[in-house]
Amino acid sequence: TLMRSSAASDVYKRQIVNYYVHSSNHVRSWYLSGDVSQNIDALNGQAGLNVGYNLSGTELLLEEVPASYENSTLTVAPRFNFRFAAWVNTEYRLEYRYTTLSIRGREPDGRHDFNQRLTVNLVPSKKWVIQFTAEHYYSQLSADRSKHLLLADASLRWKINGKWEATATAANLFGREKYAYTTFDGVSSGSYRYAIRPRNILLGASWKF
């Protein structure tokens, strides 16, 4: 892709000043991904893996000096779904990302981040269904700083009879209400803020006719 402007960045009094300069600039990018899954009869389940790689590059001006840079992201996402017993079903998913920023004349800067989710369903009898869900988020901010977030939910369903059913759900058991962090890679900075619904308990009943 041929663009008619180049990004530029200057450091002025410890502030990053971004602007555009009228010039020709080439932007290149490509993406590769693959997915595979396999049934595992011994565990009455399935395992899968998705892998993706994205690479993009262009040129920018750092303090009025042209510099080429590349940004790459490797994504690895395994998943598992097993039934260890007739009354236990477990699902686990992980998405891991490694992002690298490479600028000519500088050491590459790499960051890790991932999120994972575990869901366990218990069916001790035909009348009861219990579910637990846990989520973990991790973001690397710098070489020695990182951010974590852990969430958990639980639910219970009781089939009273052929028509009546009662449910109870407890969401955000740890009471986390926000998740915020800022990243800086020497070229740009980004601030991320997520609002989380406060801890709550919901009770319900339904009737089939």
Residue ranges: model-predicted function:
Residues 138, 158-209:
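C-terminal beta-signal and adjacent terminal beta-strands/loops
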Residues 6, 47-51, 78, 90-94, ...:
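Membrane-embedded beta-strand positions of outer-membrane beta-barrel proteins
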